[in-house]
């Protein structure tokens, strides 16, 4: 898998950027440092002016890649979901047992993230913190319906569909596979958020993980 990942380019919908940041050193520095700066300041306090100062480039140069910080957040979110989807596909491809395949997939999408050396300009551990804390801001907007029609969220929705299909492979009569799959994907983030900020209102602590919770939930739902 490591050798395969090293030659793979994670694809992001081209609607979210003006120029592909992966095509230049400046673009990669924009992505690398935007992740670090959003984590440091929070998305609301993050600006292209501050990012320009951090990377030693004019603010206007960043606007050649992204028309707004909203589009940048959409890019980061899409990159994360595409990276996660690729891991899911590779790790489950050879598994023939439907339950084993689903359990593996759930573990991948609900576990904490480890650093991936295949993408040196992207710190996936820090990016994951942004996804947990900030990614909902990419779609909780007035423009969500139009952006959805334009394909901004295709990777996110495709990942949910993959989980749903795995559930139906176990129980074809289960009527709520998409609802459960989307709950797993978003709920995994939410449980990690609760662990970090509101530990008194989650059972996912000590030796119990969000993965344990969702595996138990799915097993009971698919009976």
Residue ranges and their predicted role:
Residues 32, 36, 72-93, 104, ...:
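Alpha-helical structural segments
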Residues 1-11, 157, 161-172, 182-223:
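C-terminal peripheral helix-coil segments that are non-catalytic and often amphipathic
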Residues 83, 87, 116, 134, ...:
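A short secondary-structure junction motif
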Residues 1-11, 21, 124-129, 134-140:
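Intrinsic, short, N-terminal disordered tails of RNA polymerase sigma-factor systems
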Residues 44-71:
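Helix-turn-helix
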Residues 91-125:
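Hydrophobic alpha-helical connector segments
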Residues 100, 127-169:
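Amphipathic alpha-helical packing segments from all-alpha helical-bundle domains
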Residues 17, 22-47:
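Short, amphipathic alpha-helix enriched in basic
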């Amino acid at each position: 898998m490591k050798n395969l990942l090293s030659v793979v380019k994670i694809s992001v919908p081209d609607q979210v950027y003006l120029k592909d940041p992966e095509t230049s050193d400046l673009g990669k520095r924009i992505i690398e440092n935007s992740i670090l700066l959003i984590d440091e300041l929070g998305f609301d306090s993050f600006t292209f002016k501050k990012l320009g100062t951090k990377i030693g480039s004019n603010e206007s140069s960043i606007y050649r890649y992204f028309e707004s910080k909203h589009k940048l957040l959409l890019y980061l979110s899409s990159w994360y979901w595409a990276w996660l989807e690729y891991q899911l596909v590779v790790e489950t491809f050879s598994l023939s047992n439907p339950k084993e395949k689903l359990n593996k997939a759930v573990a991948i999408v609900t576990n904490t993230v480890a650093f991936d050396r295949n993408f040196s300009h992207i710190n996936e551990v820090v990016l994951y913190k942004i996804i947990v804390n900030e990614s909902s801001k990419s779609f909780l907007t007035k423009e969500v319906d139009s952006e959805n029609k334009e394909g901004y969220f295709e990777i996110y929705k495709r990942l949910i569909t993959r989980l749903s299909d795995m559930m139906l492979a176990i129980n074809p009569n289960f009527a709520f596979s998409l609802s459960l799959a989307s709950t797993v994907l978003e709920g995994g983030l939410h449980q990690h958020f609760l662990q970090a900020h509101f530990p008194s209102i989650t059972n996912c602590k000590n030796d119990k993980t969000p993965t344990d919770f969702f595996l138990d939930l799915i097993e009971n739902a698919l009976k």
